[in-house]
Swiss-Prot record:
<keyword id="KW-0862">Zinc</keyword>
<dbReference type="GO" id="GO:0003682">
    <property type="term" value="F:chromatin binding"/>
</dbReference>
<dbReference type="GO" id="GO:0008270">
    <property type="term" value="F:zinc ion binding"/>
</dbReference>
<comment type="subunit">
    <text>Component of a PRC1-like complex.</text>
</comment>
<feature type="domain" description="SAM">
    <location>
        <begin position="763"/>
        <end position="827"/>
    </location>
</feature>
<dbReference type="InterPro" id="IPR001660">
    <property type="entry name" value="SAM"/>
</dbReference>
<feature type="compositionally biased region" description="Polar residues">
    <location>
        <begin position="517"/>
        <end position="538"/>
    </location>
</feature>
<dbReference type="Pfam" id="PF16616">
    <property type="entry name" value="PHC2_SAM_assoc"/>
</dbReference>
<dbReference type="GO" id="GO:0005634">
    <property type="term" value="C:nucleus"/>
</dbReference>
<feature type="region of interest" description="Disordered">
    <location>
        <begin position="653"/>
        <end position="730"/>
    </location>
</feature>
<dbReference type="InterPro" id="IPR013761">
    <property type="entry name" value="SAM/pointed_sf"/>
</dbReference>
<feature type="compositionally biased region" description="Basic and acidic residues">
    <location>
        <begin position="485"/>
        <end position="498"/>
    </location>
</feature>
<dbReference type="GO" id="GO:0031519">
    <property type="term" value="C:PcG protein complex"/>
</dbReference>
<dbReference type="GO" id="GO:0045892">
    <property type="term" value="P:negative regulation of DNA-templated transcription"/>
</dbReference>
<dbReference type="GO" id="GO:0035102">
    <property type="term" value="C:PRC1 complex"/>
</dbReference>
<feature type="compositionally biased region" description="Polar residues">
    <location>
        <begin position="708"/>
        <end position="717"/>
    </location>
</feature>
<feature type="binding site">
    <location>
        <position position="618"/>
    </location>
    <ligand>
        <name>Zn(2+)</name>
    </ligand>
</feature>
Length: 827
């Protein structure tokens, strides 16, 4: 009756909602198996949340047949790997596009599973066409591992087997018939991936995967000829390679060659033959005294889970190597096993070899192989090999650590140790021998597993308990096959003692696209991980795992952007350093030049300071003052003097040609006489000279404006005012004007040499340009006269409208220029 209830509960499709945002949806149909020989208890009825003491539970149940992977986990998975530019989106998209073919494959697998459900208590070997599916309740916390298998005839693909590490707290012993079918845990899921990949036109061989639970004993079973093994706590002297050495009397369980999932194993020195279940039954065992009820009748009992606290049962028990995600990131389930055609294993079939060493009874060791997730670039092939001693009650089972996961994926350590009795000829596997409290830190593409102390309560018979860290023995595919021909275990003891101290903590930078490439030498070299692999000394105790800050790396439009919770150390690249050195060198040289220049400037300033401050005299009032107090042309001490002077000059146009030269301006400054006093007499005496020289003086030498000195008339124009009656009274008393007049007559031939013609109508374009430049504030406008090709005659014809409209000159400069032109005409 219990069997029927279990079968009914399993055959129905169910969906499991995992509290830690990890959702795994598959479809399954399984028949329950009862133990017919070793125990009378049946597997408790499966309920999704019945008796859940800890919600960090994963139950892998197949869901609706045509359901697309449209869950939040799958969508986030696609987005994450798209951002990280992994090669994972192809298969995820393929799963979505080919969900109809998935449904067909799943339907076929369910039909095959239902046909095999009738074999409830059967422990006989299953043929290829009928492989039973099982359900498993491994703890009262309702952690259920529901797996299914499918007949090889329904899906003509070669798929590797599944090795399942089963176990939890307070669960009765598992029969060999159950354990035999645990191995087929993910056959249908892998087949789905193969169907999808082949529908895309790819030949995709799938390697096997390892499903483990952290509180379980090890079960390594062949699908057809199950040979169980008890995982014993390996000590430093008993660390074996991935393929256990079994030169004498090694027993290898293989399938018949007619099966699609046959195991082709290299033959060792001892004859390796397919063993039946009946032969394996002779290796019965008593329960271990450490509380590990390891009923090791291999055909009947594979392993018994050890009694532990429920705290260690937080890790997921599922057919997909997924771990509950605390950080809310989905992990890679087997349904989303990413198939990389360029990095898949070259063999379709992975062999799970279980070998015995009856002649080494005390040192029988079981190698615990853990693969927490599937690497993004390779489908991991992992198997369990155990040396099953004749006295299995003396080989207690190690307890696996509770690994709380903060991410979607745990690291698969890339390694292959291929030997004669290797589990796979090209399989990639990794040895993680857990003993007492090694700090373990597994990281994957965007994850980081925080280390947890491994609770190990059992020890080997001969070797006392030691603190031995995780053994990591990766082998590259390029390394030649190492055949374990050593018969002395002490050599391996020495190597293992070296290797045990090499694994401290493994922390791979998250987000790096390349998988962690682990390389290892001949065995004494410490394995290296591309991210970081802190190595411990041989004599030092293993330190606590260093939890490094998680750094996310993004590639956005060609720019590598790293994102971390802590500030990055300031490290300048060599190129920047060189540039900085060059800049500093240039700056230093420039500073030296600047210093030299500043020294020269200082010298010149000192020379100038040594010179007396220039003193000016107002041309109107005769006030003597420093030059900086004089404004504009430095001729007048104030604007009042300038205005009064200009009013006087307006009356007598172009009177003294000598006033335009700087030498001439200084002499009348010496006396209080005003040059305007002699205006009347000058006009009377020399009317002809006034017209010629006055006109010529209106265009002084071009160097005069640079001295700040301009002609009389230029100053007049800047201060032009209507003549007021006060202007006449503003002039001082007449003084001897003969002197200044004679001086002006002396300068007349000098000034006429500088100009081409005294008649404005004879000026050319350059003369007009110089004339306009001499006007204050009209230097920029002079260029416009040159561009318009205005010569002397055109200048005489210019009017205000021409200046303002045609030449686009502002009103102020236009009035000044026109006033000057009028003066020239009048003169």
């Amino acid at each position: 009756m219990e069997k029927e209830q279990e079968q009914g509960s399993v055959a129905s499709s169910a969906s499991v909602t995992i509290p830690s945002t990890t959702s795994v949806s598959t479809s399954t149909s399984a028949g329950t198996l009862s133990n017919s020989s070793s125990r009378q208890q049946t597997v408790p009825q499966i309920s999704v949340y019945g008796g859940i003491t800890d919600r960090q539970t994963v139950q892998v149940i197949q869901q609706a047949l045509n359901r697309q992977p449209s869950t939040v986990a799958a969508q986030y998975l696609q987005q994450m790997y798209a951002a990280q530019q992994q090669h994972l989106m192809l298969q995820t998209a393929a799963l979505q596009q080919q969900h109809l073919s998935l449904a067909a494959v799943q339907q076929a697998s369910i039909v095959a599973g239902r046909q095999s459900c009738s074999q409830h208590g059967s422990t006989s070997q299953q043929t290829v066409a009928s492989q039973t599916t099982i359900n498993l309740a491994t703890s009262p916390a309702a952690r259920h591992l529901i797996s299914r298998a499918q007949s090889g005839s329904s899906v003509p693909v070669c798929i590797g087997q599944q090795a399942v590490l089963l176990g939890n707290s307070s669960t009765p012993t598992l029969t060999a018939s159950q354990a035999q079918m645990y191995l087929r845990a993910q056959m249908a899921q892998q087949t789905n991936l193969v169907q999808v990949a082949r529908s895309l036109g790819r030949a995709v061989p799938l390697s096997s995967q390892l499903i483990f639970t952290p509180t379980a004993s090890v079960t390594a079973i062949q699908p057809e000829a199950p040979a169980p093994s008890i995982n014993t706590p390996p000590t430093s002297g008993q660390v074996q390679n991935l393929a256990l050495r079994s030169q004498q009397g090694a027993l290898t369980s293989t399938l018949s060659q007619s099966q699609l999932q046959s195991l082709s194993v290299k033959q060792s020195v001892a004859s390796v033959t397919g063993q039946s279940v009946a032969r394996l039954k002779g290796l019965g065992a008593e329960p271990s005294p450490q509380g590990t009820a390891a009923k090791a009748s291999p055909a009947e009992t594979s392993s018994e889970t050890t009694a532990k606290n429920d705290k260690t049962s937080d890790l997921t028990t599922s057919v997909c190597p997924s771990v509950t995600s605390v950080a809310g990131h989905p992990f890679i389930s087997t349904a989303y096993t990413q198939i990389q055609t360029h990095q898949l294993l070259q063999q379709h079939k992975q062999q799970f070899v279980i070998q015995q060493q009856p002649q080494i009874l005390q040192r029988g060791q079981a190698q615990l192989l853990e693969a927490a997730a599937i690497h993004p670039h390779t489908v991991q092939a992992v198997a369990i090999q155990s040396a099953l001693p004749a006295q299995p009650q003396q080989c207690p089972i190690p307890l696996l650590p509770k690994v709380p996961v903060t991410c979607q994926q745990a690291t698969i350590f890339h390694s292959t140790t291929v030997s004669q009795q290797a589990l796979a000829q090209n399989g990639q596997a990794h040895i993680l021998t857990h003993t007492k409290a090694p700090p373990l830190q597994l990281t994957a593409v965007k994850c980081q597993i925080h280390p947890v102390q491994i609770q190990q309560g059992v020890a080997s018979q001969n070797v006392p308990d030691k603190d031995t860290p995780v053994l990591l023995e990766p082998q590259l595919l390029s390394i030649p096959i190492q055949e374990p021909t050593r018969t002395e275990l002490r050599q391996s003891d020495k190597e293992s003692q070296v290797k045990e101290n090499t694994q401290g903590s493994v922390n791979v930078k998250a987000g790096v696209g390349s998988p962690p490439a682990m390389t290892s030498g001949s065995g004494n070299n410490a394995p290296t991980v591309t991210g970081s692999a802190p190595q411990n000394g041989e004599s030092k105790p293993p330190p606590q795992a260093v939890v490094k800050p998680q750094i996310l790396t993004h590639v956005i439009e060609g720019f590598v952007i790293q994102e971390g919770a802590e500030p990055f150390p300031v490290e300048r690249p060599s190129l920047l350093i060189e540039n900085l050195k060059q800049k500093q060198h240039h700056a230093y040289s420039d500073l030296q030049k600047h210093n030299a220049d500043s020294e020269m400037e200082d010298l010149s300033l000192q020379e100038l300071n040594n010179q007396p401050e220039p003193v000016r005299t107002c041309e109107f009032c005769g006030n003597v003052d420093f030059a900086f107090n004089f404004k504009r042309s430095k001729r007048f001490c104030s604007t009042v003097c300038a205005k009064r002077y200009n009013v006087g000059c307006t009356k007598r146009m172009g009177l003294f040609p000598g006033k335009s030269s700087p030498e001439d301006t200084k002499k009348p400054k010496a006396s209080d006489e005003s040059p305007k006093n002699c205006s009347t007499e000058t006009r009377k005496r020399n009317p002809s000279i006034q017209t010629t020289t006055g006109a010529s003086l209106l265009s002084p030498h071009p160097s005069h404006p640079s001295h700040g000195e301009s002609s009389q008339c230029s100053d007049m124009s800047s201060y032009e005012e209507p003549i007021s009656p006060l202007s006449n009274s503003s002039f001082g008393a007449p003084i001897e004007h003969e002197e200044s007049f004679d001086h002006s007559r002396e300068l007349t031939p000098l000034l006429t040499q500088h100009f081409l013609a005294s008649d404005p109508t004879k000026w050319n374009v350059e003369d007009v340009y110089e004339f306009i430049c001499s006007l204050p504030g009209c230097h920029e406008i002079a260029e416009e006269f040159r561009s318009q090709e205005i010569d002397g005659q055109a200048l005489m014809l210019l009017k205000e409208d021409h200046l303002m409209s045609t030449m686009n000159i502002k009103l102020g400069p236009a009035l000044k220029i026109f006033a000057r032109i009028s003066m020239l005409k009048d003169s």
